[in-house]
């Protein structure tokens, strides 16, 4: 270790920053969060620093450097672009025995600003000793995703109880075990879920129960130190009580398949689960992020093939929670958009099972974004409607007259297998046969494919290209923007402007579309591209529709 990590108490202590530019601003921002009284010394000080340090506790001095301003400083920061001046500041601070940091000059620094993960009062500093600050920032970014914001509130709560815990639990071992149970159990779960009052009440109840179960006996060692100990049976009983409490169910949206689209909260709950019940639309990459030793149970539904009926899934969730387990119900997309999450929490509520719901990116959002098809656009669409192709008990959704607004985008979930019925019904109801429509298959995944056409042509195009499920349909004028706005997997494009025009559609960069005079595939290229398409599992659903806009 070339440097020793220390945490300075700078609240209401003077810190001198020499320099008034962007570098000084970054340091002032960090130091102000620690409560320091900051003096900025520079002939010119930018407006951002002026706004940041507008409080009367800070001081802005519009003067050239003079070492007399170092008086009473706790630390000094040299943040100028004048190398000679920075050396002088270092020499003056060293002579006064005041720690100094010369920005971006490690050999002139008595201390280094680490990359900081702030969960006040929990603070983590990461330093490369000035060797690779970018790497330190990357490590910090990784830690930011792993450490919930609730840890700060949890630490503050522990601080409030520290005295009571010490008074009621006489041994160090007993206190350590108490805090381990609190930080790994119900108290932390409540805090992370944002239920601060319930977390406080739970911690108080845990402390009272622990104190009541402790049998303490005083003893004194040869040095006269107290060695009162908690009996082993009492500690064992506490652990048993903690393990036998009611579990909790987390209804988690797994998103469209790309694991990078998971929320931080989803990832945290997945990694603390005892058992995971997952759907067919949960990608292997997402499932792999669950806790390694958690039980993983497939309860997915495919078209005309339900591994476990919904009532059976509800029962599994209830029973697992009653066993005291932390249960993750992992659902593709978002639990509340054609995901039957509402039915599951109704069942949990009926059995008084605690639960949380974590939203996910629904397939419509992912498919539109990754296909370059904005669901709304000021020039094309002022609202968006999410519709299922099938209603409850598998009945087809034939409410075509609801989908005739040309200023609205309509997204059909679970509509690929009924594509001929949908397109014919829409045209018969009065929708123009030239209305643009797209099929997006495996949205957000490396094998994503997009097929564009019109209501009149899309069935024939799909018969030729056979895009696999899972897939959804996007209908509306916004689909016409796909050709210009598509961005995903462009490195896989096979684009040939020299081939002769044909009547066939063509596949480009995972995108099959109607032919353009300036971009055609020849027959060999088309056959090669289409051979890359594989049939995946289909999907099913039985809710009606959601209108947004």
Swiss-Prot record:
User: Which sequence ranges are marked TM in the entry?
Assistant: none
As its record notes, the protein acts as a catalyst of:
uroporphyrinogen III + 2 S-adenosyl-L-methionine = precorrin-2 + 2 S-adenosyl-L-homocysteine + H(+); precorrin-2 + NAD(+) = sirohydrochlorin + NADH + 2 H(+); siroheme + 2 H(+) = sirohydrochlorin + Fe(2+)
**Which pathway does the UniProt entry assign to this protein?**
Cofactor biosynthesis; adenosylcobalamin biosynthesis; precorrin-2 from uroporphyrinogen III: step 1/1; Cofactor biosynthesis; adenosylcobalamin biosynthesis; sirohydrochlorin from precorrin-2: step 1/1; Porphyrin-containing compound metabolism; siroheme biosynthesis; precorrin-2 from uroporphyrinogen III: step 1/1; Porphyrin-containing compound metabolism; siroheme biosynthesis; siroheme from sirohydrochlorin: step 1/1
Q: Which GO biological-process labels does this protein carry?
A: cobalamin biosynthetic process; methylation; siroheme biosynthetic process
Task: Please give the residue ranges the record annotates as the region Precorrin-2 dehydrogenase /sirohydrochlorin ferrochelatase.
Answer: 1-203
Q: Which SUPFAM superfamilies match?
A: NAD(P)-binding Rossmann-fold domains, Siroheme synthase middle domains-like, Tetrapyrrole methylase
| Gene Ontology molecular function | NAD binding; precorrin-2 dehydrogenase activity; sirohydrochlorin ferrochelatase activity; uroporphyrin-III C-methyltransferase activity
Q: Does the keyword S-adenosyl-L-methionine apply?
A: yes
Instruction: Output the InterPro entries linked to this UniProt entry.
Output: 4pyrrol_Mease, 4pyrrol_Methylase_sf, 4pyrrole_Mease_sub1, 4pyrrole_Mease_sub2, CobA/CysG_C, NAD(P)-bd_dom_sf, Siro_Cobalamin_biosynth, Sirohaem_synt_dimer_dom_sf
* EC id: 2.1.1.107, 1.3.1.76, 4.99.1.4
Keywords attached to this Swiss-Prot or TrEMBL record, sorted alphabetically, are: Cobalamin biosynthesis, Lyase, Methyltransferase, Multifunctional enzyme, NAD, Oxidoreductase, Phosphoprotein, Porphyrin biosynthesis, S-adenosyl-L-methionine, Transferase
Residues involved in S-adenosyl-L-methionine binding: 256, 332-334, 337, 362-363, 414, 443
Which family is this protein grouped under?
A: In the N-terminal section; belongs to the precorrin-2 dehydrogenase / sirohydrochlorin ferrochelatase family. In the C-terminal section; belongs to the precorrin methyltransferase family.
Record's function text: Then it catalyzes the NAD-dependent ring dehydrogenation of precorrin-2 to yield sirohydrochlorin. Finally, it catalyzes the ferrochelation of sirohydrochlorin to yield siroheme.
Q: What is this protein called?
A: Siroheme synthase
Please report the organism this UniProt entry assigns to the protein: Psychrobacter arcticus (strain DSM 17307 / VKM B-2377 / 273-4)
Taxonomic path: Bacteria, Pseudomonadati, Pseudomonadota, Gammaproteobacteria, Moraxellales
